[in-house]
Amino acid sequence: MNRRDFLIKQLKGAIYLAASAAGLYLPRSVVAGVPAISQVKASHIGVAKGGPGPATRAAVGLLGGMKSFVKPGDKVAIKPNMSFPHSPESATNTHPLVTRELVAMCKEAGASRIRVLDNPTQRAERCIKTTKDALGIFNQDMVHALVNQDFYKPVSIPEGKYFKETDVMKDVLKADVLIAAPVAKSHTMTGVSLSMKGMMGLIYNRQTMHADYDLDPAIIDLCSLLKPDLVIVDLIRALSTNGPWGPGKVIRMDTVIASNDMVAADAKTVHMCEWYGQRFEPRQVDHIRIAHERGLGRMDVENLHVKHIEA
């Protein structure tokens, strides 16, 4: 996708805002059928600069630490990007040291079970190898590439407007805490692939979302069901072009973003990074805008309190 295609793809967002520029800052109840922002939980964002492990721990620390999200005895599901058999330098997968730090913090918080999960698009064991290696011999059994339908359970999506049912990983449905840990990368169909787009890696048949639905609204339907308690965006490197597979232009950011709001996390990532050679506003990404309108979170990061730290 080139810059012109990105703008065309996201034109609806620009038209929406042009029609009511102030709507981004007013309670969303002024727009028919849209929940007011006051009905959405308070959104917090932490941005840490540093290496993968230290920045991950520091970013979560800005939100009160992992114990604010994981309680003793909790079952935790962590969803990084593990779809490709590529090195961290490609920025197509979540940096394994980010994932390792999340696992360590969850163990420190007293989690009774931790699962690191994905449904890779390519050969499963090759895709998850770098993550398993990073976790070490005692934690490798936490990492699973679930490609068999037996690991999934059919569920309905009560708040789905278009995408109303799917098969979700049983481990996710059993989890007390869901942590999304995407790498920041571009995407040929949705502009970017971050925490919301990444939820597609927790269902069995995501191809139907591509083939049978308008993808951006379908993503929001799925996210109305799968709502991460904590989002960690790996912005150590960002794949700013030719995602999600690469190879493309990789930008070194040495940053990790943490938030309790998947919309805010994705919006902050879009705002911070260059995509396709230029800058975009979160509202120009359809699924971010739609999520904001439907009350799943906030894209108006300029109105949120963002904490920063050097790790």
Question: Where are these predicted regions, by residue range?
Answer:
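N-terminal and secondary-structure boundary signal
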Residues: 1-311
